[in-house]
Amino acid sequence: MAAQTFALRLLLVGTLLGTLLGQGCCQHWSYGLSPGGKRELDGLSETLGNQIVGSFPHVATPCRVLGCAEESPFPKIYRMKGFLDAVTDRENGNRTYKK
């Protein structure tokens, strides 16, 4: 009997604690956030102030500044995968004929 009472009290305390901690840690859509954690960026310049946003120089081509590649590596990976699949098929005796 005492074990059941203790278990019920422990369950009640855990539920209350979980509810209180969940309310304190989670973001809510009414604070400028959309459901899913997405923030609306329309009022970003008013939030940050025009001085901060206006101080960044406009760059016409960001790849020159950041040094990013002109071509994404993903097409190269897919071409390599196709090549390796074709080689593997030939080694296994399978022939692929194009019409």
Curated annotation (Swiss-Prot):
<feature type="modified residue" description="Pyrrolidone carboxylic acid">
    <location>
        <position position="27"/>
    </location>
</feature>
<keyword id="KW-0873">Pyrrolidone carboxylic acid</keyword>
<keyword id="KW-0964">Secreted</keyword>
<dbReference type="GO" id="GO:0005615">
    <property type="term" value="C:extracellular space"/>
</dbReference>
<dbReference type="GO" id="GO:0005179">
    <property type="term" value="F:hormone activity"/>
</dbReference>
<feature type="modified residue" description="Glycine amide">
    <location>
        <position position="36"/>
    </location>
</feature>
<keyword id="KW-0732">Signal</keyword>
<comment type="function">
    <text>Stimulates the secretion of gonadotropins.</text>
</comment>
<keyword id="KW-0165">Cleavage on pair of basic residues</keyword>
<dbReference type="InterPro" id="IPR002012">
    <property type="entry name" value="GnRH"/>
</dbReference>
<feature type="signal peptide">
    <location>
        <begin position="1"/>
        <end position="26"/>
    </location>
</feature>
<keyword id="KW-0372">Hormone</keyword>
<protein>
    <recommendedName>
        <fullName>Progonadoliberin-1</fullName>
    </recommendedName>
</protein>
<comment type="similarity">
    <text>Belongs to the GnRH family.</text>
</comment>
<keyword id="KW-0027">Amidation</keyword>
